Amino acid sequence: MLRAALLLACLLPGVALAQAVAEPEGYRGAPYAAPVPEGLAGATTVHLEEARRLWEEGEVAFVDVLPREPKPADLPEDTIWRERPHDSIPGTAWLPNTGYEALSPEEEAYLEGGLRAVTGGDPTRPVLFFCKTDCWMSWNAAKRTLGMGYRNVFWFPEGADGWAGAGYGTEPAEPMVLP
């Protein structure tokens, strides 16, 4: 009896870890680096090989939403601040800070403008969102884009680090500058 109880106790954590993450009704807040759902209602979830195929075909706009690291508020005034470099999937539009649970009006306008730029203003043009593996930011941005009326939305949960980990090339990214 004791052995059975110990065996059950050892197996339960694995069962808990294997449970699927539910999609929230709204947007997900912090912590953003956490297990993500299997998919996003209304979007097409793609994994590494499918994302690579879409990238090679060149018909889908790739959008990275990894946030920029903020300048520390307590940094002395005469200190030079250098942002950490960010590598991403080649040809990607980097729209940082657009995957948070709540966006400021400026961040919302930046996302809308970036989407118009990469889709030519066509809400039927396919657009793929990513960040890092197990990052809710790309899920939030894809969900928000669906709410804006875009109809061909892809979500790539493995993100840029999954891409790089598979040996696919990356390149330095700069945030998209809108006119």
Report residues per predicted region.
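Rhodanese-like catalytic fold shared by cysteine-dependent sulfurtransferases
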Residues: 16-49, 54-57, 72-128, 132-179
